[in-house]
Amino acid sequence: MTIFQKSFILLIIWNFSLFAFSDMKIEITHGINTAHPIAVIPFINNENITHELNNDNIEDIASIIAADLRNSGKFNTLPIAYLPYQPSKLTDIIPTFWEKLGINTVVLGAINIKNENYVISYQLIDTSNNPALVILDNQYEIEKKHLRYTAHTISDEIFEKLTGIKGVFCTRIAYILYTNNIKYAYELCTSDYDGHNQVSICRSSEPLMSPAWSPDGKKLAYVTFASGHSELIIQTLTNRSIDNIIQFPNHNGAPAWSPDGKKLAFSLSKTGSLNLYIMDLSSNNIQQITSNRYNNTEPSWFPDSQNLAYTSDQGGVPQVYKININNNRDSHRISWLNGSNQKPNISMDGTFMVMVNRNKGKQYISKLNFLTGEEETLTADSVLADTPSISPNGIMFMYSSIILNNSSSELYLDKKFTNIPDNNQSILSLASIDGKFKAHLNGSTGSIRFPTWSSLSCSY
């Protein structure tokens, strides 16, 4: 390791201090009226501990669960103010009452204090039966700091019971936050999927780009320009250590972890043109995957850890291609929507991908279904949607979206993402993979770019 590398690592670690920010809030903009109705009743507590709970300013468990289910796009949680009565136990449930409201699922819960811990219990009740039937229940004894995580865990359990799909409410996201801070304009941040518990991982006066989670959620790979040119960093989140620094001449960027966690794909221009490379993380050996005079970048892995989707301009404009890492002659185009297509992100089950489609002066997020060959636009109401990332369960995706103060988006499509004028803010958006549900995360103090969703195995 060179003296420069050691100094650089110390700089990164010094800037790693955990800076907390105000939480963001999800604002649903489209699709909630078509979702399945459900009621999450405020959790009850013993009268003798009510005062202690209030003074402790604990998280509102029921509100978090309701928000999670609503944010999935599959449930419409009935506002508490609309409930004529709030049952506290199973025997209080009157099925005919809920039937008139069009609700056949109700969540009841309670919170108590045991020693210095909190005991959270809940029941998921089917009100279409008479008498009402408990179809799921559980209890947790936890420390106060784990209240929000426990609420997300309950949401995951309820979501999977009702849909058969694993929930993603306990996952984390990472993104780059751009602010007006003169000293540190760029920050790599992580947060809960809903924007709460935001933490700064790294701050820099130079651009940070393209964060990517390891499959176990313990590391992030990202691009930094702290040294004056691009370098690729792999950083462990628990102890703040730098595991790898990839710093070849010219461009180093677009990292992507293989699903098995054994390899990292990225793009380099050390030979002039941008080409794809793979590092074996156990040996640090680097293998070149593409070797031509075109720009090949933005790799995304298929589930087998043997095939990559990537962006290439070998046909004249950026399109998405697929290549086998063991046979670089087996490369073929897989995107065909009008205009250009780039920045692919493959679903964890490998059945579809989302990508950025540029066409007629606008930029959308589009989807390609590998099973049917169908391509469709998911964000037709967006002007400059970018960098999509699919949720681990494959039913949602996040992306950055530019709010243009200038009415013409065409002025900016040929510019680099980091050069978009400061008066146009980039926000974090959330949408269902069928395009029917959309929401924005509001409350950030700056522009959010390059969002990426952790795997199901990632936790706090």
UniProtKB/Swiss-Prot annotation:
Q: What does it do?
A: Part of the Tol-Pal system, which plays a role in outer membrane invagination during cell division and is important for maintaining outer membrane integrity. TolB occupies a key intermediary position in the Tol-Pal system because it communicates directly with both membrane-embedded components, Pal in the outer membrane and TolA in the inner membrane.
Protein known as = Tol-Pal system protein TolB
GO biological process terms, alphabetically, are: cell division; protein import
Source species, domain of life: Bacteria
Subunit (UniProt): The Tol-Pal system is composed of five core proteins: the inner membrane proteins TolA, TolQ and TolR, the periplasmic protein TolB and the outer membrane protein Pal. They form a network linking the inner and outer membranes and the peptidoglycan layer.
- Signal sequence span is 1-22
Tell me the keywords, alphabetical order: Cell cycle, Cell division, Periplasm, Signal
